[in-house]
Design a protein with these regions (language model features):
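AAA+ P-loop NTPase catalytic core and its hallmark functional loops
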Residues: 1-5, 10-234
């Protein structure tokens, strides 16, 4: 799969269509599932789930990249804001290549729905979806799933696994929760070292809708900054 670009020439990786084994460094789920970092609760610089919401062309995807890299590197937003942009983009692509950041274009994955996101039946077998596979392979350090341009119906991808998104339901917490997936009958958990960063257009995702998920997601508004143009002749 070839890369593409979003916004002001920011490179992204079309990770949805890449063969997982060629990207992710932990093909053995049995080894990854026992790694202690999956239960680590010590990292508190960022929420487990962030939804960046704003009008078109206000830098939502750029903010998502900054957030994802900050999570991986353990740098807060103030530190990330003074990082040279080319360095941030280089690090972002490096983490995509290493399998620490998974970029998902929501319109692409939405066409497959739950089947492509969590799991699907393939004859007598069950095939893992991209979200389930990535979550199961989280081992040392931290991992980020970036979901770009979600819409009002995006939570339908999670179905029964949506309950696992809350911070206090993750692995290693006092209320750690597992759900039994309906197709594979497997017990599925979300590790504490997995973070979700999503973007949405404020016109598409109305306040009444995003308000319904504010217990699970920290909603970060992004607004235009017309003052930047003050005094400029355009």
């Amino acid at each position: 799969s070839s890369g593409s670009s979003t916004g002001a020439g920011i490179p992204i990786a079309a990770s949805v269509s890449i063969t997982p084994e060629s990207v992710w460094p932990y093909p053995d789920n049995a080894i990854a599932s026992t790694h202690p970092d999956r239960k680590d609760q010590s990292f508190r610089l960022y929420p487990k789930n962030t939804l960046i919401k704003g009008p078109v062309k206000t830098g939502k995807f750029h903010q998502a990249i900054m957030t994802a890299v900050g999570i991986i590197e353990g740098k807060d937003s103030n530190m990330m804001n003074i990082e040279p942009v080319p360095d941030v983009l280089e690090h972002y692509q490096q983490y995509v290549d290493e399998g620490r950041i998974l970029h998902i274009s929501y319109p692409d994955i939405n066409s497959d729905g739950y089947d492509g996101f969590i799991e699907r039946k393939c004859g007598p077998f069950t095939e893992d979806g991209i979200f389930k596979k990535f979550a199961n392979q989280c081992a040392d350090g931290r991992y980020v799933i970036m979901m770009e341009e979600v819409d009002l119906n995006w939570m339908h991808l999670f179905r029964e696994t949506a309950v696992l998104l809350r911070e206090n339901r993750r692995e290693g917490t006092s209320s750690e929760t597992a759900v039994t997936l309906p197709l594979s009958k497997e017990k599925f958990r979300l590790p504490s070292n997995l973070y979700i960063v999503a973007t949405c257009d404020s016109i598409v995702c109305e306040d009444t809708i995003t308000g319904a998920i504010d217990h699970d997601f920290f909603i970060r508004p992004v607004s235009p900054e017309p003052e930047i143009l003050h005094g400029m002749r355009i």
